[in-house]
Amino acid sequence: MLMAVDIGNTQTVLGYFEGERLRASWRMTTEPYRSPDEVGAACAALFALRGLSLEDADAMIVSSVVPDLTGTYRHLAADILQVPFYAVGPEMDLGMENRYDDPSAVGADRLVNAVAARRYYGAPAIIADSGTATTVCAVDAGGAYRGGAILPGLYVSMDALASRTAKLPRVDLEEEPPRAIATNTPDSIRSGFIYGYAGAIDALIRRFKEELAAEGETEGLRVVATGGLSPVISRYCREIEVLDPDLTLKGLQVLYALNASRAR
């Protein structure tokens, strides 16, 4: 069993793989200062809820944007579970070219999404990931990671608005805005965030398509949405073709299979 871990700034997603099959997944709050024992206990409890055992893990792979927690999971794998540990980073073989100016500066989650999109949807591809940050990234027709765009996530922007204004509340974005032209303040905020972010993502995707088209890179292009907030926002996006909430976990499994086989 492979334990795949996607550590984000707000949430950590765990995946349990049998071969290429994602058997179960869980989300928990990212808490950077928890000890390996505490993290292990939390993971074990989540596994047990599905009738699974953490001790069945025979390897762990981690994608992390929180460096402190990378070390925590490394310790959990090596010293407690005593299984091989893989961390997505500059030294890992991605099986694809990384054409970022500084390849080591790309967020691990962005690379993992690119790997998964190419594997499951082909190249070229555009990936929109809606989480703590919203990212839109491109894979060209040759299968290379080309880079992308980053903007604040929905709730990061919501927190900024609520904290910097006296009369604009934090609202639940899971509730659908009835119309773009809203007639009360909560719905006006929902309209601005939902339709505004959907429009921003669509605009970026269209610009990506234009730039890739100028290089003859758009034949067969797919546009994929993922991330914890993707179910909220993607249905309002006109450019999104596929919603795959498990894309990052699937990319981790692809990278594990590639790197574990070469380590043997």
Swiss-Prot record:
- Compartment list: Cytoplasm
The leader peptide range reads none
Q: Does the keyword Nucleotide-binding apply?
A: yes
Q: Name one GO cellular component term.
A: cytoplasm
Entry annotated with the keyword Transferase: yes
Q: Which residues bind K(+)?
A: 129
What is the name attached to this protein's record? Type III pantothenate kinase
State which gene encodes it: coaX
